[in-house]
């Protein structure tokens, strides 16, 4: 079952706010949304921006654990990053998505700003070490070149690095994370926006369980049937459409496998060109258990759902495997 059957509208990554009530039937509880990381992480900030302040954010240590959260009854939805404008795709998320019975129902693009955060009273001159996720450290290379005395300390999570610094009370240590981490843990921002590239954005997707054959048991989540899930599926398209600032459009993510022969990829892409479907992204990933053979992940976009269905019908005959990973309105470009 797909949430988006047609061009329902466009999600605004800056303006979309949706408050969801209980997923369990109680008016006093809120939608539980799993994410990878600690409280104060960019994923949590994206979930709150997309779904509203009333959600209950469920932090998990790893992507694997986050994907299991729904099956384990710890959450009803999952918010996961799939792509960064500088670092590229989050390949583990794509692998887990393909193994699961979760489907993309919405997306949001979040600007990524890295701040240097320390204990209250700490100063930049007094720092000796800076901790954060390796990707965040790498995206702040110019800052470290300007402050060569600072030791870089890899950490599991951006927000977690700030939490640990604040818990230690060590004024000679700091972490790199988003502003929300400083707010969450009471940290002081010692230097703002220290990332090398201001055009740094991460695309996050909201995932819900759907009926899907072939899902691996540990990731096969029960299909949510509570009133709040029904409300989410009913209200989200209209709310996103209300905030659209361009003609309604439909985005579709899919995975496919092809015969190992010349021209197979060209034959698979021709239906999109023939029907005027815009190919936004194509990326290959190894097929687990089949060395040197690959599957492809695609994102396409159109304002003509009928043409998209025609293209998909033609695509099925050109592929050995085809799975729709989600239909949803494209998020507005956060850099606009």
What are these regions (language model features)?
Residues 2-336:
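Domain-level signature for soluble enzymes in the chorismate/prephenate branch of the shikimate pathway
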